[in-house]
Structure formats: structure tokens, C-alpha cells
Amino acid sequence: MAPLAKKRVVLVDTAGLPGNDPALRLQLESLASARIKAKNYLVLAATSQSQVLKAAYHSYKRCGLSGCILTKLDEAASLGEVLGLAIGQQLPVAYVTDGPRIPDDLHVPRSHQLVSRAVGLQAAEEPSEDAMAQLFAGLYHNPAKRAG
């Protein structure tokens, strides 16, 4: 770790180890014993389902989380679940990624940009009134479609 001492940010990947894994605990203890100022951030994929996000949080919350990093924003159909977890657990969003190239696609988020992106994704999901009218008109005029 000595060569990294002058770096502003060093990301250490736990390679999917659960929060209660002995190897992870040793890794965290070695960082603490080296008197390295370390902050633990939970990495959450914005493409994950709510149960997966909650399981990750509950697995790692004992590690003393300083916040979270949201990944795969460019692939997500919605940001509601991942932002809901961050807000509900009071995890500050330290970084976001919106592409596969790190560090180029790693950004410090701005709350208004996250909210704007989430609202934009939600608005894109909602069908127009015309589309809904055509769908229901088709069901009304063709009873066979209603049956299944």
C-alpha cells in the first residue's frame, strides 16, 4: 500500500465477497492496522433488483459504510430502486459510473443530475395517452384479445 499513499483515491475491489467473509474482514483489518485512512463504500449496480440491493447493504453494513458508489447508470431502465436504498439507508452517493471505462466514466454526482436522470427514465417508460387509447380500443373491439 505504500506506493499508493500519495494517491487521492484508491479503489479496492472485494471481488464479490460477502460482508461477513473472513478474508474480507482480514483485508479491512490490515488496512486499519496500517493506519491508512480508509472509507468503505458499497458498490451498487443500478441495474440490480431491490432484493439484491437490500441483501448487499445488509451484508456490508457492518463494515462501517461511508456511502455508496452507483454503477451502470448508462444501462439502467430505472434509478428508483437504487436511489431508494441510498436514501432509505442514508448512504451518501460518493461516485457514479455511466460507462465501462474507469476512471473516465467515474464521476462525482450532483443531486439535481441524478434526480433529472431518474425522472427522465421514468417519463420514458410511461406510454402516451394515444398509445393507451389504441390499446384499450383494440381490446374493446376485439374480445378474443381480452380472453388471453
Segments (PLM) and residue ranges:
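Short, solvent-exposed amphipathic alpha-helical segments in soluble enzyme
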Residues: 27-29, 57-61, 83-88, 111
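Switch II (G3) loop of P-loop NTPases
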Residues: 1-26, 33-35, 42-46
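Short beta->alpha connector loops
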Residues: 17, 47-49, 74-76
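Conserved ATPase-coupling elements of RecA-like P-loop NTPase cores
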Residues: 19-27, 52-54, 78-81
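P-loop NTPase motor core
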Residues: 45-60
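NTP-binding/hydrolysis catalytic cores, primarily Walker-type P-loop NTPases
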Residues: 86-148
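A polyampholytic, Gly/Pro-enriched intrinsically disordered region
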Residues: 8, 12, 61, 65, ...
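Conserved beta-strand/loop subsegment of P-loop NTPase cores
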Residues: 37-44, 61-103
